[in-house]
């Protein structure tokens, strides 16, 4: 929610978030699309408890990727939170390690098309240390274009 609020009035930054909703702190509904000049530059994709790989694939394919294609970013910044992993004790989302690699690959393809592959990832959440380690490794291997993603 801090990143969303930082850029919600800036039309030069397209902010996208997938997250469990409702969940603390209660922000991130579909209706939050930006403020003022930034209206329309925020895409929240709230997920119900129990959302899984199929749910995320659908949202990525039907909402996120088309929106990113329209925006044509100069760089893609990933706030890589792994607390949606099925083993994470704090959330209710059921993503697998492999699906993090799938999402990373889709974003890399967008970066290749629109910003000469410029992509930056920073680590955010993830509270099951084994799942976090595997997911981060999978994400980094994908970013490095390794063929043998976990």
Predicted segments, located by residue:
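A general "terminal functional-core" signal
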Residues: 1-150
């Amino acid at each position: 929610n801090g990143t969303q609020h930082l850029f919600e009035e800036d039309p030069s930054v397209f902010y996208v978030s997938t997250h469990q909703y409702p969940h603390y702190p209660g922000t991130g509904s579909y209706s939050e699309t930006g403020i003022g000049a930034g209206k329309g530059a925020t895409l929240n994709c709230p997920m119900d408890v129990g959302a899984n790989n199929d749910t995320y694939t659908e949202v990525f394919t039907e909402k996120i990727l088309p929106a990113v294609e329209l925006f044509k970013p100069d760089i893609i910044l990933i706030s890589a939170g792994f607390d949606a992993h099925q083993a994470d004790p704090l959330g209710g989302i059921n993503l697998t390690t492999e699906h993090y690699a799938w999402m990373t690959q889709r974003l890399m393809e967008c970066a290749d098309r629109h910003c000469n592959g410029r992509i930056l990832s920073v680590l955010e959440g993830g509270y099951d240390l084994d799942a976090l380690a595997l997911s981060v490794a999978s994400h980094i291997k994908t970013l490095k274009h390794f063929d043998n993603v976990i």
